[in-house]
């Protein structure tokens, strides 16, 4: 099987890493791409994946928010993950600008894209 690089955590063929450094959404997406050539801000496709990511974010960040790779800053109405995956799993909590996920229960909230939150990066192994 594929081993994630040092410092990354593996779940069902994907690698994840939480960074304890706040930045805006655009910088966070660029930051993830710099960490690994296939990496983007995290996208969620199942509740199991959500539980895994919460288990990684909460111990580091406690009660806070992480950026997800979901925004509508480029295309009105079209919602897709920044890594190009289609939106097939949803947990909305309102209107979207850029989306954050709570570190405690993965409730999704919209936030101004210029606010600073923590990146969680993900890529397919």
Curated annotation (Swiss-Prot):
What is the documented function of this protein? Answer: Potent platelet activator that aggregates platelets via both GPIbalpha (GP1BA) and GPVI (GP6). Induces a tyrosine phosphorylation profile in platelets that resembles this produced by collagen, involving the time dependent tyrosine phosphorylation of Fc receptor gamma chain (FCGR1A), phospholipase Cgamma2 (PLCG2), and LAT.
- Identify the domain of life: Eukaryota
- The main location class comes to secreted
* Keyword Amino-acid biosynthesis among UniProt keywords: no
Tissue specificity, in the record's words, reads: Expressed by the venom gland.
- UniProt-annotated location(s): Secreted
Name of protein: Snaclec alboaggregin-A subunit beta
Q: How does it assemble?
A: Heterotetramer of the subunits alpha, alpha', beta and beta'; disulfide-linked.
Q: Which GO terms describe its molecular function?
A: toxin activity
